[in-house]
């Protein structure tokens, strides 16, 4: 793999035998050719330096070694066979060619006659630069989607006290991760659990129930006073929801009061928070819990869904689910009850939302293969940040061209005063960002870039 000669020892026996062999190897070496333990990532680094692997594939290999779920594994394997490095290099070569045209005019304009003025040449080059900027913009957007697969999707449960948020979390993760009680305000802080949902790594957070001082607890007839600890829990719950990628809004079927009929409870605090989340463009799924009490409402499930949709019309009906954590926990799958509590359909809805979040954007740009957008999901955070920096330099170049064009409309004599040196510098800086992506070419301090990548590997890789 490294491109160097390798000697492997296949040792039989326990740890003591391995330790003895390693000790013996240390004694057999000479001072001129010492033998030492490999540093983290050293074998992979040597493979890179010997041109056996490029830097984007090195990062994909690191993702493969740390993959926990199936979707993470697929993303990392895709990265090891994708053409990200060659694509970055082709973009860099395009910028080098564009920069060369500008610098030719800078260096030889006094000795040679050029058909185009500086502003005209820059305007001609800007067509390619604008196309590249658009490609990089969508590439970077897809990289953000890929990071959701790589780092995990943040999911929060939001609702009033006692609607069954903790029971829902326990049912999703398959164990008692959160305390379940009939007492209001049992959950005071965010309880976060990592779980594999359909191959997607998800960080699921249970939060404190939302209510105001003037609101009644769902299981009590009299008003409960909120203490300072619970107030802080409610504040953290709202903050957690705003930071999450997906929010599950939990309502429940409850009796309005002692002896009164059951109906869906949608408290003011919860609805206000939901509208704030919608304004922040958050992905919301609604779970209407305790549907085992549906018969006591005199309503059909479709009527309950319609009532929620009327209160929150921005949420489509296919993201509103009627469930029963009680039935899901107490019943087993069978031919008679294939989906107890409609819980499987609810989880499928969550997974479909995850797919929508992580499917690549395909802008259908002329002259591009659709496969590049799927591959762009594999771009790491380091690559995305460099792409964003590259875009900043490209936008600077385009802004200079636009300003010169606007000035030329006002005064024709200004056209020849376009500063090609500054424009060429913007293209050089953009090309250097692309070079740092692969660790090749004029990448500035490449050693610093490589150090960041390889130090994440364990010893022996």
Language-model-detected regions and their locations in the chain:
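Mature, matrix/stroma-exposed regions of nuclear-encoded mitochondrial and chloroplast proteins
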Residues: 65, 113, 215-226, 278-280, ...
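Conserved G1/Walker A P-loop phosphate-binding module
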Residues: 101-241, 448, 456
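Conserved P-loop NTPase architecture
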Residues: 1-154, 373-454, 458-461
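Canonical P-loop GTPase G-domain recognition
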Residues: 131, 283-285, 292-375
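Intrinsically disordered, low-complexity domain-flanking/linker segments in eukaryotic proteins
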Residues: 216-225, 258-265, 272, 306, ...
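Conserved C-terminal guanine-recognition region of P-loop GTPase G domains, centered on the G4
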Residues: 200, 227, 231-319
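Short, conserved glycine- and acidic-residue-centered signature motifs
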Residues: 230-233, 339, 423
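Conserved nucleotide-binding/hydrolysis micro-motifs of P-loop NTPases
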Residues: 13-17, 53-55, 67, 185, ...
